[in-house]
From Swiss-Prot:
Localisation per UniProt entry: Plastid, Chloroplast
Classification lineage: Eukaryota, Viridiplantae, Streptophyta, Embryophyta, Tracheophyta
GO MF term set: RNA binding
Keywords: Chloroplast, mRNA processing, Plastid, RNA-binding, tRNA processing
Disulfide bonds: none
Function: Usually encoded in the trnK tRNA gene intron. Probably assists in splicing its own and other chloroplast group II introns.
GO terms (BP aspect): mRNA processing; RNA splicing; tRNA processing
Protein name: Maturase K
GO cellular component terms given for this protein: chloroplast
InterPro entries: Domain_X, Maturase_MatK, Maturase_MatK_N
Gene source species: Humulus lupulus (European hop)
Broad class of where this protein is predominantly found: plastid
Pfam families associated with the record: Intron_maturas2, MatK_N
Family, as annotated: Belongs to the intron maturase 2 family. MatK subfamily.
């Protein structure tokens, strides 16, 4: 953050002129490029092509065209290929939007740092990941009785997103540019289709739309916490995880009133009070309570009226269901979590009398939803809808090494993400699909059959599918196969997973 502040020399006047660095400062686009590379490396995802945007020639040409005001006026009837630019119009729109997101984020980030008042901010790679949510479930939810899945609705009009920023952005031209981005190259229908509402996070303009989404949701969560404070007479403390869009800034403790005064960069948040727990990641939140459903109903209608009356977002109370935690499994972050009761009999003896006691222990069980996962693989053309492997025809032009590396990386990432599941047998079906899909892709490239190809090269060709967890545990326990097998079947939560995998995100 000091680097941003040193380069840009931010002060309060930037609130009135946000377009200046976007048009006159070339290193803004370097920040965008570096952020994209770091995000791809840290999250073990494939590179999405940020190297193609780092060309100084392209950036200079883009900025020189922006000096001419008429080139920023783009009609919806124009062709996607701009003959003046020489590149696809959406390519330049994406570059400008990501640079715009960097410029607008900086005042929020500086405000967050100043709000910590001397508290040391630890770098993101030393902090918790989204896997830390599940130990929170395991610790708190066995003592709760009711749970509710809440899908946060999107605004039905683009102007609502712009109005959220108007409270602090005084630069009218920046708001007009924001409207241009929203109407130009983004399909608003995605906001209206529930099962695609989170798909914006995996698109090419991730930083830009994640910024808009966080500004909208955190505004609603601030009001939600105000209502929560009014319902409690105790001054409780709450711990929150602060993100820079994807990464944690730190896990700090503050009074609730102070935390949510500067809560803009929050992407993952959880708070607790005497009777209710709240967890959110991106567009889905979980409400859980120990008491009777009356309290849950109260909070449900709070949410609905808040969305409808304050944010002009249509929602119905009937779409939010309250379920018993002991009888209902809820999906969150790609896992299917449910309550499991372990029964045991304890023999106790007191003086000359002995008796048996039945002991029931509640435990949160995290499972892998195999059907949605196979559906995601089918959508990516690795298999059909019933799980039969297919060749990946779009990768057939790559080298053998690149084909194997891509398939193996996807397999390792899935095993890495689902390491916290108590039952990993279903993952071996996914491994089988990816391995056979890889072989079929290689056989298609070499114009051969699968059997002939394997007979010629041998099974050692697919050693890359040996998962990371298996490698690590085999090094620690090289001679005790039973111990290795027991540990690998256990739950392992990692601290280096900063965003949900596209194949895992079934929402």
């Amino acid at each position: 953050m000091a680097e941003f502040q040193g380069y840009l020399e931010l002060d309060r006047s930037w609130q009135h002129d946000l377009l200046y660095p976007l048009i006159f400062r070339e290193y803004i686009y370097t920040f965008v490029h570096d952020h994209g590379l770091n995000r791809n490396r840290s999250n073990l995802l494939e590179n999405v092509g940020y190297d193609n945007k780092s060309s100084l020639l392209i950036v200079k040409r883009l900025i020189s065209r922006m000096y001419q005001q008429n080139h920023l006026i783009i009609s919806a009837n124009d062709s996607n290929q701009n003959p003046v630019f020489g590149y696809n119009k959406n390519f330049y729109s994406q570059m400008i939007s990501e640079g715009f997101a960097v410029v607008v984020e900086i005042p929020f980030s500086l405000r967050l740092v100043s709000s910590l008042k001397g508290t040391e901010v630890v770098k993101y790679y030393n902090l918790q990941s989204i896997h830390s949510t599940f130990p929170f479930f395991e610790d708190k939810f066995p003592h709760l009785n009711y749970v509710s899945d809440v899908l946060i609705p999107y605004p039905i009009h683009l102007e609502i997103l712009v109005q959220t920023l108007r409270y602090w952005v005084k630069d009218v031209s920046s708001l007009h540019l924001l409207r241009l981005f929203l109407h130009e190259y983004y399909s608003w229908n995605r906001f209206l289709i529930p099962n695609k509402s989170i798909s914006i996070f995996s698109k090419s303009n991730l930083r830009f739309f994640l910024f808009l989404y966080n500004s909208h949701v955190c505004e609603y969560e601030s009001i939600l916490l105000f209502l929560r404070n009014q319902s409690s007479h105790l001054r409780l403390t709450s711990s929150g995880g602060f993100f820079e869009r994807i990464y944690f800034y730190g896990k700090i403790k503050h009074p609730v009133e102070e935390v949510f005064a500067d809560d803009f960069p929050t992407s993952l948040w959880f708070f607790q009070d005497l009777v209710i727990h709240y967890v959110r990641y991106q567009g889905k939140s979980i409400l859980a309570s120990k008491d009777m459903p009356l309290l849950m109903n109260k909070w449900k209608y709070y949410l609905v009226h808040l969305w409808q009356c304050h944010f002009y977002v249509w929602s119905q109370a009937g779409s939010i269901y309250i379920n018993q935690l002991s009888k209902h499994a809820f999906g969150f972050l790609g896992y299917l979590s449910s309550m499991r009761i372990n029964l045991s009999v304890v023999r106790s003896q007191m003086l000359e009398n002995s008796f048996l006691m039945d002991n029931a222990m509640k435990k949160i069980d995290t499972l892998i939803p195999i059907s949605p996962l196979i559906g995601s693989l089918a959508k990516m053309k690795f298999c059909n809808v019933v799980g039969q492997p297919l060749s990946k025809s779009t990768w057939a032009d790559l080298s053998d090494f690149d084909i194997i590396d891509r398939f193996a990386r996807i397999c390792r990432n899935l095993f890495h993400y689902y390491s916290g599941s108590s039952k990993k047998k279903s993952l071996y079906r996914v491994k089988y699909i990816l391995r056979l899909s890889c072989v079929k892709t290689l056989a298609r490239k070499h114009k051969s059959t699968v059997r002939t190809f394997l007979k010629r090269l041998g099974s050692e060709l697919l050693d890359e599918f040996f998962t990371e967890e298996e490698e690590v545990l085999s090094l620690i326990f090289p001679r005790t196969y039973s111990t290795l097998r027991r540990l690998y079947k256990g739950r392992i939560w990692y601290l280096d997973i900063f965003c949900i995998n596209d194949l895992v995100n079934h929402e």
